[in-house]
Amino acid sequence: MMDLIISTILLSLFIHFFDKFAKKRTIDGAYRIYVSVSNNKDLKKNKEILEQLLTVKKELNATSSQDQFAKWARLNRKYEQLSQEWEKQSANVKIFQDTFKRVLSLFLWILTRGFRFYIQFKESKTPVFFLPAFLLPSWALWVLSLPRSIYGSVSLTVWNFAVQKTISGIF
């Protein structure tokens, strides 16, 4: 019984701190790894256009608009064209990035919360601890034992809820 109390607290602490501090970094890191090993044409094209854009911008900044106007105008047109093309391509990449991050976030949510739900389902009949019958009215004892625990005990579901609220209130 004591191991159920402690494991529930530790699991809730892990989930809370993972969501608060590590989830965004994990998702961003996974996306960066995917981009570096991916053969996605849109990602490669976006990177190539960005490299060309930066090269043209560097040349444009090095060229005087008064002394070498023809060269500067040609580079400026090329820069504007690449800039528009990069913006269009970036919109496609942004949609893909948002979808990738949303799917990975859902996977992590299922992984962390799913484990908690599994434990709650598996141990739903196991009481976490018992309360004295004179301490609370009978309806309160019944509510604390929901969904399937023994009357007069605190169920794992109620205990999990209390632990989560306490942790989120403290941290």
UniProtKB/Swiss-Prot annotation:
Protein name per UniProt: Protein get1
Family: Belongs to the WRB/GET1 family.
Any coiled-coil regions, as ranges: 38-95
Assigned keywords, A-Z: Coiled coil, Endoplasmic reticulum, Membrane, Phosphoprotein, Transmembrane, Transmembrane helix, Transport
Topological relation to the membrane, as annotated: Multi-pass membrane protein
KW Transport (keyword) present: yes
Pfam families in the cross-refs: CHD5 (PF04420)
GO cellular component, one term: endoplasmic reticulum membrane
Record topology, Lumenal segments: 1-4, 130-153
UniProt KW Hydrolase keyword: no
One of the protein's GO biological processes: tail-anchored membrane protein insertion into ER membrane
PANTHER family in the record: GUIDED ENTRY OF TAIL-ANCHORED PROTEINS FACTOR 1, TAIL-ANCHORED PROTEIN INSERTION RECEPTOR WRB
InterPro entries assigned to the protein according to its UniProt record, in alphabetical order: Get1 (IPR028945), Get1_fungi (IPR027538), Helix_hairpin_bin_sf (IPR029012)
Domain of life: Eukaryota
Main location class: endoplasmic reticulum
TM segment ranges: 5-24, 109-129, 154-170
Molecular function terms, GO-annotated: membrane insertase activity; protein-membrane adaptor activity
Location of this chain's protein in the cell: Endoplasmic reticulum membrane
Subunit structure: Interacts with get3.
Stated role: Required for the post-translational delivery of tail-anchored (TA) proteins to the endoplasmic reticulum. Acts as a membrane receptor for soluble get3, which recognizes and selectively binds the transmembrane domain of TA proteins in the cytosol.
Organism: Schizosaccharomyces pombe (strain 972 / ATCC 24843)
Residues that bear Phosphoserine: S65
Signal peptide (residue range): none
Residues in the Cytoplasmic compartment per record: 25-108, 171
